A protein has these predicted regions:
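N-terminal low-complexity, acidic/polar interaction/targeting segments
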Residues: 1-206
């Protein structure tokens, strides 16, 4: 049986200039008919979130589950999404409900290379240092303590607003867990350097 006969097909929810990494929980405002059509066509409450930068779709998306449908404070529709895991995108079709694509779901290995553990420890330390500089150390420590898998730990970089969208896209597209941790760690180190510089500037002018 060919991949096209077995691969699940999910509606695409385009993310313009945004990236949602696996493990993230987000509330998504539904702002146009394209988004509404994708959500309404969800298969068993599942869709695939695909970054769209400068009009081009990324080759990797994130399978997500719709866990809530609500009205936002401004009266518009919103949905609560739980991002589950990566997916390579296959052939697509444009139909009445919008864009539907075959997905090859990518699950992180349960036993990544030993190097991943060392990178994960360093990643935790850098993120914790940033959080403590911002007076948010306890909450972030509790959050990180609940994440055991190195690949999922790297994906927490998606929550950092200072990390550029293009960098988050590279993290999304990095399937290998060790390489992904390196990419996420480099991004967090740059974030730490920026936060440290801003802190020194504030201290100098105070």
């Amino acid at each position: 049986m060919s991949q096209s006969e077995t691969a699940p097909r999910l509606p695409v929810l385009p993310l313009d200039d945004a990236v949602v990494l696996p493990g993230m929980s987000v509330t998504f405002p539904v702002s146009d008919d394209e988004q509404a059509a994708a959500l309404d066509a969800a298969v068993e409450n599942r869709i695939v979130l695909v970054p769209r930068l400068e009009g081009a779709f990324a080759p990797i998306g994130t399978v997500a589950e719709i866990v809530g449908d609500m009205a936002l404070p401004d009266g518009t529709r919103g949905v609560a999404l739980e991002a589950v895991h990566r997916a390579r995108l296959g052939p697509a079709e444009v139909g009445a409900p919008g864009l539907v694509v075959e997905v090859d779901e990518v699950i992180d290995p349960s036993d990544p290379a030993p190097e991943a553990d060392e990178l994960a420890r360093e990643y935790r330390a850098v993120v914790q240092e940033v959080a403590e500089m911002r007076g948010d150390g306890v909450r972030v420590a509790q959050f990180l303590a609940g994440i055991e898998r190195p690949g999922r730990l790297a994906d927490t970089a998606g929550y950092a607003p200072e990390i550029p969208v293009g960098r988050k896209l590279r993290i999304l597209e990095t399937i290998d867990v060790v390489d992904r941790l390196r990419e996420a760690l480099d991004a967090q180190r740059e974030r730490l350097a920026d936060v440290s510089l801003r802190r020194r500037i504030r201290q100098d002018v105070s």
